[in-house]
Amino acid sequence: MQSMPLLLRQSLRSSANLTRTSRQVRPRFLPAAGPNIYAARDIRRSFSVCVQCQFRSQPTLYLSLEKDKSKDEPVAQQPNDMDPVTTSPHETPKAQPEAEGEHPSSAPAEQETVSRLEEEFKNEPASETTEKRGLPSYLEERRSKYSKQFTEMMDNLQSNVFVAGQRLNDLTGYSSIEALKKDIQVQEERLRTARLRVREAKDSYAAAINRRSASQREVNELLQRKHAWSPADLERFTHLYRNDHTNEVAEMETQEALSAAERESEEAAAQLSKSILSRYHEEQVWSDKIRRMSTWGTWGLMGVNVLLFLIFQIAVEPWRRKRLVKGFEEKVIEAIEKEKTLNHIEILHPQNTLSSTSPASQEEAAETSILTTSEPPAAADETATTTTATTTATTTSEISASEPETTPAAAPKADEPAPVLTLEATEEPAHKNAVTGLLDSCKSQLARIPPPPSAVESWRQTFHDLFSDRSISITQRDLTSVALQSAAAGAAIMGLVIALIRPR
């Protein structure tokens, strides 16, 4: 057997060994499987000054921390009495590099997923809308949406119309009249209640009078047979005499209540009549104001019409006439130029045809030219005057028809230049005379158009034309319409004059 000191010494050694192993096995820092709290600090210590870059790096950092925490939750939930040998301090340096290596790899992956989700979210609505536009469900949904909007609008239409009418009444001053109408309705209800109360007070007063008269009648009957009273008659007499005072007080109270009810009814009737009179007065004032506004509006419209009439007669009508005259002059000048070019073409065309005629025709033309040259001057003058008269009197078509007839006589030979000169000398004055005659006719037609008169002259001419002796033809319908319009205008003017002159 061992001694007690030896046993105590062994027990102390075993306890010391246990305490040493527990102190050596338990680490002072977090286990390797715990969350790496220094990774965020390393990223935050980056020397980037850009705030946007730091902000973009934060979500990935937080996601990595949350992942590490989710991974470490099962390890943290293990029992505290785990085997100390499994968690040695030599394993912590290996686990920390692994955890530190997970953060840089997780950040790009998170950024890629976020960007992919954003692209899908952006591309999804457009594709869905393009696909759904042709579907019956999409059309039905649109129809139901539009029908709901239409029903809401129709439901709000009545309220909107009511609000618009209320605003119009506020502007015209009819809202106060509506308030008076409501006050009159309240006064009528009050008068009705007061009259009902008066009727009830009358009934109660009549009942009190009947009750007191009945008790007095019975008392008088008992007094008439006073010598033959029985004990019951004596008790009845004392009871009636005692109730007589009560009946008298009740009669007085009912009389006062009746007088108060009648007074209240009279006050309600007076207030009602006063409200009715004030409403009638306000309605008269409102109707006068509306009538006056309508009168001024009518006068304003008439003034606008007169102003527009004056503007058109003074400014627009002369401008329109000048424009028409100018346009007509331009058209006439254009027609004259066109006629001039046509005449020039028709005169040059026979000369070209003369150059291509036969020798026999050229000989005949030479003979005719010799004859024309051998004529005396007086005959030449007569022929010139006749030709000018014919050219001015005839049209362009006649000139073109007569020129081919005279062209054979005007074709000279190559060896006779004198007849050619005389033919050209006779054709040019004819062409000039035709052009001058046409110009004179156009000028005479333009001279017939009177110049546009001024505003004062036009008014003077119109006024003189109204009272002139010019004879016109008019139908019975037009005459009847003019008479009716004149009568209506006279009645309207007289009504306006009477409304303005009428004493207020």
From Swiss-Prot:
Biased composition (Low complexity): 372-412
Region (Disordered): 65-140, 352-414
Topology class, membrane: Multi-pass membrane protein
Mitochondrial matrix topological intervals: 502-504
Stretches of the chain found on the membrane's Mitochondrial intermembrane side: 317-480
GO biological process: inner mitochondrial membrane organization
Bias kind Polar residues: ranges: 77-90, 352-361
Transmembrane feature ranges: 296-316, 481-501
Protein task: Required for the maintenance of the structure of the mitochondrial inner membrane. Involved in mitochondrial morphology. Causes growth arrest when highly overexpressed.
UniProt xrefs under PANTHER family: SENSITIVE TO HIGH EXPRESSION PROTEIN 9, MITOCHONDRIAL
Quaternary state and interactors: Homooligomer.
Name of the protein in question: Sensitive to high expression protein 9 homolog, mitochondrial
Species classification: Eukaryota, Fungi, Dikarya, Ascomycota, Pezizomycotina
